[in-house]
């Protein structure tokens, strides 16, 4: 059985990156929530 976690930085950024989050209304909501909570890192 192959490992379920196969690290890939390009996919990581594409799926969970800042620009991806900013591209949708709900993504911006996530960022706003993380800012309000005081997260040091907002996205991947």
UniProtKB/Swiss-Prot annotation:
InterPro entries: Ribosomal_bL34 (IPR000271). Residues 9-44 have a biased composition (Basic residues). Keywords: Ribonucleoprotein, Ribosomal protein. GO terms for biological process: translation. The keyword Ribonucleoprotein applies. Residues 1-44 are annotated as: Disordered. One of its GO terms (molecular function) is structural constituent of ribosome. One of its GO terms (cellular component) is ribosome. It comes from the Bacteria. NCBIfam families: rpmH_bact. Belongs to the bacterial ribosomal protein bL34 family. This is Large ribosomal subunit protein bL34. It comes from Brevibacillus brevis (strain 47 / JCM 6285 / NBRC 100599). The gene is rpmH.
